[in-house]
Regions:
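Short C-terminal domain-edge/linker segments immediately following a structured domain
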Residues: 71-75, 118-119, 140-143, 168-176, ...
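Short, structured patches in soluble enzyme cores that scaffold and shape functional sites
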Residues: 112, 123-125, 141-145, 157
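Short, charged/polar surface micro-motifs in flexible loops or helix N-caps
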Residues: 103, 116-118, 145-148, 161
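Short, conserved beta-strand element in jelly-roll/cupin
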Residues: 130-148
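Non-heme Fe(II)-dependent double-stranded beta-helix
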Residues: 1-123, 127-132, 168
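A general structural signal for short secondary-structure boundary/capping elements
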Residues: 87-88, 134, 182-187
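Short beta-strand segments in beta-sandwich/barrel cores
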Residues: 39, 145, 153
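Double-stranded beta-helix
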Residues: 149-187
Length: 187
């Protein structure tokens, strides 16, 4: 697992190289990583950047470059839009995520939601498993004002310390050429 999941972040993170480069708010949240498992960064991107990404997503949908999936997702927009790719590759965000993992992060996917997915509690690691375990990290970027009825992301504090559940734990065997046959509700 990543170093902040193995150690107590409250005692070790402040001595880590480059810790001082982060704002005091981010530093305080990093010290709580071991117990929380997430950071809440406000206004990392400007309103203009957010507006630009929203326009880019709308253009991709209207030009039919990327269809909206059955669950209101626009997947891999960064492959078709330099604006979305620029946000995904944001240097400050990558430095923070790399600091948390103590490895250089490699962004590999964007999901834009037309409206909140309303997805139930789940673990992303069952679908995107890293080897060794513990090196999956995500950034959820709100591109609109968030309220309880908008289908916002939720996270259970400390759930990053729970044992990993993998597809094999559900007898849902997949190969490179075949996906398993389990439904979402089976998980």
């Amino acid at each position: 697992s990543a170093w902040l999941d193995v150690n107590d972040s409250a005692t070790v993170v402040s001595s880590k190289e480059n810790f001082e480069r982060f704002s005091s708010d981010v530093q305080q949240q990093l010290q709580q990583w071991s117990s929380n498992g997430f950071l809440h960064i406000k206004q990392h991107f400007s309103n203009q950047q957010v507006d630009d990404v929203n326009r880019a997503v709308d253009e991709l949908i209207h030009q039919k470059h990327l269809p909206i999936t059955h669950d209101n997702k626009v997947m891999y927009g960064y492959k078709h839009s330099p604006v979305i790719k620029q946000m995904m590759q944001d240097g400050g965000l990558k430095k923070l995520l790399s600091f948390i993992l103590d490895k250089e992060v490699v962004p590999f996917q964007t999901l834009n939601f037309v409206k909140g997915s309303g997805q139930r509690a789940h673990s992303d690691s069952i679908h995107m498993t890293t080897y060794p375990l513990g090196y999956l990290i995500a950034a959820w970027i709100a591109l609109e004002d968030i309220h309880p009825d908008s289908g916002p992301l939720f996270y259970y504090r400390g759930s990053h310390k729970l044992p990993y559940l993998l597809n094999d734990d559900f007898e849902n065997y997949s190969t490179r050429l075949k996906l398993g046959n389990k439904q979402y509700s089976d998980y």
